[in-house]
Design a protein with these regions (language model features):
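Bacterial N-terminal signal peptides
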Residues: 11-23
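Mature catalytic domains of secreted/periplasmic carbohydrate-active enzymes
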Residues: 30-450
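Bacterial N-terminal signal peptides that target proteins for export
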Residues: 2-14
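Sec/Tat signal peptide C-region and signal peptidase I cleavage site
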Residues: 25-28
Length: 450
């Protein structure tokens, strides 16, 4: 590096540090910062990972009605906020959570630092409505970061841009509007104070917890949904200055096409039918989904997804070049519910023998047979059976192209029949012996060198 290049690099570092460390006025004056690396460069680990753990946890675990508990009933003044004085998750063991996630094949985890109810799971410098003022008294976010990093997982924060408890925020999905049809409209001073709180909270999370790999911002408001309600350029400039390698999702605007700058797209509780594009360009994407029907702990929600459904959802995402962020909702004591643990352990059993068909894989250009999905890594195509086959399986477009087929569950080689005689095969179709296979089985198909 010559002297001029060194000087320019140093100026860039100093400028980024100034935006990151400075107060509101400095950051607001700065022009929007673009990270030095592209989203694709920063997201190499994300595309390799394919599977992550989402964790929705807060004081809403006490009423145990899900993460929107604050909006689900007409609480008396101060009634919901009083849960903070009872919040004491003495069984919170994030190292156990991390080991559970790692065994299930998850490579990263995202924790709610604050949800829409405004309660901070970290030691906020800007409000006393936080976990360090509860009987627990410790920073749950810091403990999460330390534990998951120690197990070798990437870490990220979910952070709610809305705060239903702040007078500066207006929302047609707020408790007041849902329960009484009333829309609180803040004064300009209240709105300015609210935006400052959002900015300061995000900056604290970006500066006091070491390297953060992912930021999942969330926005629910349908009030002025088409406007830049949160000063997104200001927030993005600060975030990228503080964390140059971070990935930021698409929810700084209610509608994804309004948010000019984002690194990955986040469909919710669904698997898209194809690799995703936004404004004509391919984007990294991640489906977030619940392991039952609620994000936060809900004592009456027993609609748990089966391990087979979880695996099928994961495969569906990877086969379309996407990720799955699977959510668990710990209870008020800090425990992941036993049914969720059981299912993740079952997924871990599947992953022990089949993990290579997910990690580092993406879509395949070959068309999968009936009841199957394909993932691919280099010259290896993985055939995932989403249901037990009726008998043998016909592979479209692969006749004469496969060197070897192995059942990952057993390591046994699968035979390829070129002639059967009782059906009409197209010239490019290959019949293989799959009688006795079951849902969740994966065939490793090594293609011949061309």
């Amino acid at each position: 590096m010559n002297g001029l290049m060194k000087a320019n690099a140093l100026r860039s570092v100093i400028a980024a540090a100034a935006v990151c460390a400075a107060g509101a006025a400095t950051a607001e004056a700065a022009s929007p910062a673009a990270p030095a690396k592209s989203a694709e460069e920063r997201g190499a680990w994300f595309r390799e990972a394919r599977f992550g753990m989402f964790i929705h946890w807060g004081v809403y675990s006490i009423p145990a009605m899900g993460e929107w508990a604050y909006a689900q009933k007409p609480w008396k003044p101060g009634e919901y906020e009083a849960f903070a004085a009872k919040f004491n998750p003495t069984r919170y063991n994030p190292r156990e959570w991390a080991r559970l996630a790692k065994a299930a094949g998850m490579k990263y985890a995202v924790l709610t630092s604050r949800h829409h109810d405004g309660f901070c799971m970290f030691d906020s410098h800007f409000t006393d409505y936080k976990i360090t003022k509860s009987p627990y008294g410790r920073d749950a976010v810091r403990e999460f970061v330390d534990a998951f990093r120690a197990e070798g997982l990437k870490v990220g924060f979910y952070h709610s841009l809305p705060d239903w408890t702040h007078p500066g925020y207006a929302d047609k999905e707020s408790p007041e509007f849902i329960q009484r049809g009333e829309l609180h409209v803040p004064t300009p001073e209240q709105y300015a104070a609210f935006k400052e709180l959002v900015f300061n909270h995000v900056r604290q999370l970006m500066t006091e917890y070491g390297k953060i790999d992912l930021l999942f911002l969330d926005y629910t408001s349908k009030y002025k949904a088409d406007e830049d309600y949160f000063d997104r350029e200001r927030i993005l400039s600060m975030v990228y200055a503080c964390q140059p390698d971070i990935l930021v999702n698409d929810r700084l605007s209610y509608w994804k096409d309004n948010c000019r700058d984002f690194d990955y797209y986040t469909p919710e509780i669904c698997v898209p039918n194809q690799p995703q594009k936004v404004k004509g360009r391919p984007v990294m994407w991640e489906t977030c989904a619940t392991i039952n029907d609620n994000w936060g702990f809900a004592k009456d929600d027993n609609n748990w997804k089966t391990p087979e459904a979880i695996v099928a959802g994961l495969v569906g995402c990877v086969s379309r070049d996407g990720n799955l962020l699977l959510n668990v909702g710990p209870n008020e004591l800090g425990e992941i519910p036993a049914p969720a643990v059981e299912r993740l352990k079952a997924v871990a059993d599947w992953f022990k023998t089949n993990g290579e068909s997910v990690t580092g894989c993406g879509k395949s250009d070959f068309r999968p047979p009936f009841g199957c999905a394909y993932t691919q890594k280099g010259s290896v195509v993985y055939c995932h059976f989403l249901q037990p086959p009726l008998g043998d399986t016909i592979l479209p477009g692969l006749k004469g192209k496969v060197e070897r087929i192995t059942l990952l569950r057993t390591g046994e080689e699968v035979g390829q029949d070129n002639v059967w005689g009782f059906e009409l095969l197209l010239p490019d179709e290959q019949r293989i012996r799959t009688r006795g296979l079951r849902a969740g089985d994966v065939l490793k198909m090594e293609l011949k060198k061309q």
